């Protein structure tokens, strides 16, 4: 594989947004948000592989399954990384009218209609365990990615079954499992509100909310090992500059009238909110 020269990550993120969402060029705040989210996904690639250049060289021409693709933030970064001869199978069971300010249908159609990245992505709207069980070829892939999707899932038991399904579908293939999730660790005091907001929503999940459970890296690691995966490299990204912390604080405030454990966590959250809310640290892991 020939080494690839990688542009500055900020310039690359801006270029990817220009390719997949050119209308944002006249909207400064949505453009800032989209670029920061893409920068973060590129940083995830760098964390998994040691550098963005190493990620590009490893993924070029490969087939990648992304589980929990949502509106495609990680999908775009993966489509760039696999190049013109690679492929991304992006799986998400959520209804296509889910999501705001852009639904999954709108976001996925927008990416599909972009060139050349859109042609590298196949969207699969079904439960990922069912998808892996029904399509034998789907599991024999090079990499399986779960980026900020575990907290959306219905239970830790389901995550354990998902890890088993991916391991079983991979068979003798040397598939690698790449995980990135909020690590329930705070290195910036301004991120404490994000942690409490996630804990509150996990204690009393919102019907249409993002957070459905609380999961620390140790528990995720144990679920994966019990499913037959072997530990690999782990890295942390400290308090990434994205807006998720503020979004989760806003979502948690809709639980203001609730009781129980969630009420106490909301009080803790409000007590530490002081100015802009930063994000928790992100835990990344590569399993074999």
Q: What are these regions, as identified by a protein language model?
A:
Residues 211-228:
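Short alpha-helix
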Residues 2-56:
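Class I SAM-dependent methyltransferase Rossmann-like catalytic core
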């Amino acid at each position: 594989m020939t080494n690839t020269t990688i542009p500055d990550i900020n310039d690359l993120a801006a270029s990817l947004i220009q390719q997949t969402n050119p209308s944002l060029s006249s909207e400064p705040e949505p453009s800032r948000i989209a670029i920061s989210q893409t920068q973060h996904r590129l940083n995830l690639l760098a964390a998994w592989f040691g550098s963005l250049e190493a990620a590009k060289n490893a993924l070029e021409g490969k087939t990648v399954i992304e589980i929990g693709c949502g509106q495609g933030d990680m999908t775009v970064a993966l489509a760039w990384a696999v190049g013109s001869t690679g492929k991304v199978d992006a799986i998400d069971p959520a209804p296509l009218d889910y999501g705001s300010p852009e639904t999954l249908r709108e976001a996925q159609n927008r990416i599909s209609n972009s060139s050349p990245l859109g042609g590298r992505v196949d969207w699969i709207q079904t439960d990922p365990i069912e998808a892996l069980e029904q399509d034998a070829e789907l599991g024999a892939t090079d990499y399986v990615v779960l980026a900020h999707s575990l907290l959306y899932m219905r239970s830790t038991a389901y995550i354990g079954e998902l890890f088993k399904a991916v391991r079983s579908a991979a068979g003798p293939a040397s598939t690698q499992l790449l995980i990135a999730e909020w690590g329930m660790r705070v290195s910036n005091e301004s991120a404490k509100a994000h942690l409490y907001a996630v804990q509150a929503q996990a204690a009393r999940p919102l019907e249409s909310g993002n957070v459905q459970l609380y999961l620390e890296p140790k528990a995720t690691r144990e679920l994966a090992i019990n499913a037959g995966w072997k530990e690999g490299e782990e890295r942390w990204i400290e308090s990434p500059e994205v807006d998720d912390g503020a979004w989760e604080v806003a979502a948690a405030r809709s639980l203001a009238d609730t009781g129980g454990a969630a009420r106490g966590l909301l009080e803790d959250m409000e007590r530490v909110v002081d100015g802009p809310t930063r994000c928790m640290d992100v835990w990344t892991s590569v399993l074999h």
